[in-house]
Amino acid sequence: EAETAGQSEQQPESDSTEHQVADRRGTVAGKSMVERFGQIPGLCLASGYTAPRDLTDLTTLPFLYEDMEPFTNRIIYYETSRGCPYRCSYCLSSIDKKVRLRDISVVKRELQFFLDQNVKQVKFIDRTFNCDHKHAMEIWQYIYEHDNGVTNFHFEISADILREEEIALLNRFRPGLAQLEIGVQSTNPETIRAIHRVMDVDKLEKIVAAIHRGQNIHQHLDLIAGLPFEDYESFGRSFDRVYAIQPEQLQLGFLKVLKGSYMHEHAQEYGIRYLEQPPYEEIGRAS
């Protein structure tokens, strides 16, 4: 403690280690701090887990963008829901199956703030934005009715569950008001079953085509290379089928085997070899 006495106001150098500096004598303060860790719910300590923490009410979380100066000309990342009702084996969101929503009145107030600020792009990070149809429709209706002619909104959706009234509303949007990111990942039926994905590929194609006919929304379709039961030939078929839909952008990613996911538990079963450190990307298959 002698070496750090009188330096509590100085910030430690940034590295991978968490620093705690006690002001003046740290003997008692340090002991109290360590003892208190065990009383904090939701921590994983060397001695084991502390008591579980209740899921956070999203409406109680603070709004982070009151001061927009640090975010000038930057993409704004915004969240109105957490959790996902689907069980995609590569995704950590599948662990939290209970979908929680931020109160819609709060969401509308915050969206209006972004619109008033003429933010260039607001990117929703909700895992499946339209899994709650009422919530999605209220937000889409709001940005349609309050469009400022400048702001673009990005949504990650499941296209095959879009309803007719949702498609009709999207077709009325100003060109550039919204863009949709649609995860296809694979069109191989065996792969889709293996990754626990619920998706009607034929219906997805028709809905993407219906949105495309409106010529007003940028559609960004995703594929993942390296999924179970997907080889070069079958992946090529997935690529050709998605390319034929004519999305404005086709994004190819490589499978990431995230710790805690179903895919991580069964990677050896599928012969998947991957990086043990971030980004945990697949690097090959066992021969």
Annotated model-derived regions:
Residues 1, 29, 127, 185, ...:
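Flexible loop residues that form catalytic
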Residues 1-8, 12-108, 112-116:
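Acidic, low-complexity intrinsically disordered segments
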Residues 86, 133-134, 184, 190-195, ...:
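Flexible glycine/acidic-rich beta-alpha junction loops that bind and position SAM and/or redox cofactors
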Residues 40-41, 122, 153, 180, ...:
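Hydrophobic/aromatic residues located in beta-strands of well-ordered beta-sheets
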Residues 62-213, 225, 286:
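Radical SAM [4Fe-4S] cluster-binding motif and immediate context
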Residues 137-144, 233-247:
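Short, electropositive alpha-helical surface patch
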Residues 1, 172-178, 242-250:
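Structural recognition of alpha->loop->beta junctions
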